[in-house]
Amino acid sequence: IHRVEEAGADLLHLDIMDGHFVPNISFGIPIIESIREITRLKFDTHLMISNPEKYLEPFKKAGADSLTVHLEVCPDPARIIDAIHVLKMECGLVVNPATPVEEIFPYLQLIQLVLVMSVEPGFGGQSFQPGSLEKIRRLRARIDALGLDLPIQVDGGINPDTAPSVRGAGADLLVAGSAVFRAPDPAAAIRTLRG
């Protein structure tokens, strides 16, 4: 964590997986509490979990700065967006590769971040799905047409080869795991990804 913080990372994107919504299990609230003590980086907390509404307040108390939830697990997205805002936190919505990006359009004016998954959620090291580029373009066009200052974040398969086309399609924030954490020089990797 200190290594990527010193390398100039803007935030830490924390993938929380429950073994239900996605097949993998990662870490949870106790780990967030522990790492909150050692860094001031923003915790961009990506909840790949079923029933996220049950865990909003515990994640806030643990030190999460923002909570991003999957559209696919929210029967009433406006309700969970409101619940996150009541906690005085930023809220993001995620759209998976198979979900039409237009399903997120009704909520764009209510959220602070849109996360486009460019791989299937749940496992690292997957290849970028090129079809995500058109989804990013359509999302960028809609956000711009509405006159919103709403960042588009892209997660999955981000590396020096995919980053330029993702940025070119309209993404603002790139989530890079292996490309940064496995790099011999994380600062150089971050600079390369930023373009």
Q: Which residues fall in each region the model found?
A:
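Active-site beta-loop-alpha junctions enriched in small/polar residues
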Residues: 17-19, 48-52, 72, 96-98, ...
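Conserved, mostly hydrophobic/aromatic
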Residues: 4, 15, 59, 114, ...
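Catalytic cores of alpha/beta
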Residues: 53-61, 99-111, 156-174
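C-terminal helical cap(s) of enzyme catalytic domains, especially alpha/beta-barrels
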Residues: 84, 167, 179-195
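Glycine-rich, proline-tolerant flexible connector loops at the mouths of alpha/beta enzymes
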Residues: 11-29, 71, 119-127
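A structural motif
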Residues: 6-11, 64, 111, 171
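Conserved anion-binding
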Residues: 38, 54-55, 64-151
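Structural motif
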Residues: 7, 38, 62, 87, ...
